[in-house]
Amino acid sequence: WLLAAATLAACSKEVSGYDPPALADRTVLLYMPGQSLIAYYENNIQGIRTAVTDRALGKGRMLVCWQPDDQTSAVMQEIYYDRNKRCSEAKTLKTYDDFDAGDPAAVQQLFADAAELAPARNYGLIIGCHGKAWIPASGGVLPRSMLPADDVWTMAPGAKPTRSFGDTGYELDIT
């Protein structure tokens, strides 16, 4: 009787449809801060879920961090292929209840969390949000017609192509 009970208990255990690699070849983080482009973010996530098949990621991992509810919280999710369900799934890895996309320390912590939660040999970062070209976040919002012509069309020597990104009030400079 005891052997039969042990056998039944072993058979009832569900086998996971996804086993993340201990060390992925590559982890890609899609970081989409802010709320003003939320419909586009949702469309992007759905597109990724459609693209993730049983072979799409190989030994890699796909993370998405976005702010679906408001400007002060964020969620980091992994999109993966579940071989039992035969479709892509999204799993929340971490939630941020007090997140400021304009705070370099908060964004740095988010990147560190991604590396800890999905360790990899290589990392990729995709940022999807508003950007201000080479204007720093402190430059405010200026219509192009108000800027001097050479400030609009000529980058400062040694400047990176993008200097800041994010929603108004939540911009972050790239240094």
Over which residues does each language-model region extend?
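C-terminal motif of bacterial Sec signal peptides marking the signal peptidase cleavage site
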Residues: 7-10
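Sec-dependent signal peptide recognition
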Residues: 1-4
